[in-house]
Amino acid sequence: YKRLYFRTKPSMPFSATVGMQSAGFFGGTTTFYENGEVTRSYHLSRGAKMFLKMLIPTDGGVDYYAGSSLGSWDLALRYRLRNGATIRGYMQKPFENGSGIGFMNGFDALWGLEYKAPEPGWISGAVVEYIDLTNQSGPNHWDPDDFPGTTMGGESTGADDYYNNFEYNSFANYGMSLGTPFIPSPIYNTNGCLQFLNNRVRGFHIGIEGQAGTQWAYRALGGYRKGWGTPLMPLLEPESSTSVMIEGKYMPASVKGLEVCLQLAGDKGSMFGDHFGALFAVRYSGTLTFGKK
């Protein structure tokens, strides 16, 4: 993992942060299956030389890099109002290869606007986000170096296929996507596939939270997304989903550290189906004492 960021003086009313981050891994074993049977398997190179190729890719040939890498360009602009409230606009632009690093993937990014109040109130914070991952540097990927002897000498660096890789399982943690929940995670695949099957998505998210006095608090989240499959495996019909969550908390003044929480959430649409859930929780944060010494 490597990153490089620059930030202006954060104590000033206006502050900007810009930079990029990149994560990758190499080595391991790749196994291919067909109809549940292993068809072939091979070990990928590892060692100090491969580590350097993964860490610092170069140009030229078919072995100019090693492993699987992905990352993002990040930009955040924050302004502090005179009353102490802050407004922050931010962008995270993903990349899987050189085309994304060179901003050839169009408008693809997470775009957000966030508000934070100087102190708790009816509206303590709010956020609006828009995500678009439909460009992916174009619909095709072609590199003549991948097919020795071909007469097609042109090159097309599209079909970035975010989060997926030919030789490795997708970037997921126990089947859940990393970085954004807008891309349906592999754990939801009903066919057992470990890849992301719907990474060409577009959607938005809104959230708001606040408090009514010192004992009551609320949070409301809502979002909508629409997906068209992947660049290499598009869906015949797009899928969509609407998700909503409402949360209420009670924090009695008589018992410091005690919270009683109720959440109601639901999904509706063809992407995940129609679902409804509820959560009731009692939390205590503090020191438990039984009697006095």
Stretches found by the model and what they are:
Residues 1-149, 204, 222-228, 237-239, ...:
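Signature for the C-terminal beta-barrel architecture of outer-membrane proteins
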Residues 9, 80-82, 106, 199, ...:
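Surface-exposed coil/turn segments at beta-strand junctions on protein surfaces, enriched
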Residues 14, 85, 216, 254-256, ...:
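Secondary-structure boundary/capping signal
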Residues 141-230:
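C-terminal structural cap/anchor segments
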Residues 194, 270-273:
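C-terminal region/CTD detector
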Residues 203-207, 213-270:
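C-terminal structured domain segments
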Residues 274-293:
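Outer-membrane beta-barrel "beta-signal"
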